[in-house]
Amino acid sequence: MEKIKSTTILAVRRNGKTVIAGDGQVTLGSAVVKHTAKKIRVLNEGKVIVGFAGSAADGLALMERLEEKLNKYKGNLVKSAVELAKDWRLDKYLRRLEAVMIAADKNNMLLLSGNGDVIEPDEPVLAIGSGGDYARSAALALYRNTDLDARKIVEEAMKIAGEICIYTNQNFVIEEIE
């Protein structure tokens, strides 16, 4: 079976508001097989937003693990992310999962990968997936050169990514927290 390709996830924080968006396209080989996939979830009673790129089943499994860590560490996102990254890197089952995640709360924005990475960006703009570089570039330009709020930056940058990346569409799921 051909590999499923997708997606674009973008996170921006400005003026106390964190916004994460994901597009809805899932591509299998040269065909779009779904237009309305939901790759963004809200965890920890609405205090954490997570988006994933890669295998849907793997991304959902990792979100469940992150939620368990958030419960264990009383909502501390950084501690939970570090512990998940350790497990992801060391556990024989988890190591095979093919997904990358962005997790954010009102104060933190983190990229988590199966390599054990937990990366906080220098600026509060972070993106993953096939259209991630396009979305991040557009978002950084808007963040640095306009007074647009986080949601508007995300909306505009995702539109640009969707115009450039063939694995990204214009059906966005957007979540925000303050």
Swiss-Prot record:
GO molecular function per UniProt: metal ion binding; threonine-type endopeptidase activity
Catalytic residues as annotated in Swiss-Prot or TrEMBL: 7
SUPFAM superfamilies: N-terminal nucleophile aminohydrolases (Ntn hydrolases) (SSF56235)
Catalytic activities: ATP-dependent cleavage of peptide bonds with broad specificity
Enzyme class: hydrolase
Modes of activity regulation: Allosterically activated by HslU binding.
EC nos: 3.4.25.2
Keywords per UniProt: Allosteric enzyme, Cytoplasm, Hydrolase, Metal-binding, Protease, Sodium, Threonine protease
A GO CC term attached to the entry: proteasome core complex
Amino acids binding Na(+): 162, 165, 168
Summary of the function given for this chain in its UniProt record: Protease subunit of a proteasome-like degradation complex believed to be a general protein degrading machinery.
Subunit structure: A double ring-shaped homohexamer of HslV is capped on each side by a ring-shaped HslU homohexamer. The assembly of the HslU/HslV complex is dependent on binding of ATP.
Family: Belongs to the peptidase T1B family. HslV subfamily.
Protein name: ATP-dependent protease subunit HslV
Native source organism of the sequence: Sulfurihydrogenibium sp. (strain YO3AOP1)
